[in-house]
Amino acid sequence: MRVGITGVSGLIGSALADDLRADGHQVVGISRHEVAGGLAWDIEAGKLDPAALEGIDAIVHLAGESIQGRWTAAKKQRILRSRVDSTNLLASTIASLDQPPRVVVSGSAMGYYGDRGDEVLTESAAAGTGFLADVTRAWEEAAAPIADHRVRLCTARTSIVLATEGGALPRMRTITRVGLGGALGSGRQFWSWITLDDEVAALRFLIDNEVEGPVNIATSNAVRQREFAKRLGAALGRPAIVPAPGVAIRTALGEMGRALLLDSTRLEPRVLLEAGFAFESPDLGAAFGLLLDT
């Protein structure tokens, strides 16, 4: 199977590429700079060679500006445009193909739902409000035309991905190891999560199985943030009792801190579960034990 991956150098993209190659599949990395076995695209100029995608079996679209860092007006534009413009380019290129891929898994995120308190959010839940909700809604809308061209389309609403190689966990581990872990704000906000291995397995499941539409990529065991901190502390043998007031987080990190740390998003992966997907690491404490070798 030939699989195209945008964002192939990122945490999820690189892990997915390695996993596919290990099983003998051909990976075509789609990036700004052409690499061996891949191809380059110019999103700003709207250039992607259609011939290079002819006959490809699947595309996993993960490209986008990192949401980490202070959200200045310029940063927010890059977050939005990198996702929407790249997806528009991919959709228009697929529309021109004689042999389009049979499936496209297009990136999205749990930010689609916004800050929802204790509400259990399945894929049928309405979009929320706020910057990330606006971005992910526009991102998914840009991908929608792909389904008009004999292509099965999934939108992967990914949660917090736990990995030792990158993402949020290394920073949280460092903070906890020096004794500064604890509740952020009230600590009552739900954090939805998945390990990197399960994330990769879920994306491959979407490629291989007849699933379409939005898909929550998270375990069904979302936990309150204070419980997340407690379990991380237990895995590291450190207390997690130092709170960070919400006002301090908002002052220090601005809108980004509120959205990523204080918003509550309690995902239920109903589509994955009903399709028969099995998580290897559904328990947070056990996942920390595996990831942190404790």
Feature annotation, model-predicted:
Residues 88-130:
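Conserved Rossmann-fold NAD(P)-dependent oxidoreductase catalytic core, especially the SDR/UDP-sugar
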Residues 137, 149, 162-171, 205-215:
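Glycine/proline-rich active-site loop of Rossmann-fold NAD(P)-dependent oxidoreductases
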Residues 108, 141-164:
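Conserved beta-loop-beta element that borders a ligand/cofactor-binding pocket
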Residues 35-36, 40-86:
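NAD(P)H-binding glycine-rich loop region in Rossmannoid oxidoreductase-like domains
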Residues 259-294:
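C-terminal amphipathic/interface module of NAD(P)-dependent oxidoreductases
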Residues 208-255, 289-294:
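Mid/C-terminal beta-alpha module of Rossmann-like enzyme folds, strongest
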Residues 3-23:
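N-terminal Rossmann NAD(P)H-binding glycine-rich loop of SDR-like oxidoreductase domains
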Residues 173-181, 189-223:
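Alpha-helical substrate-binding/gating segment
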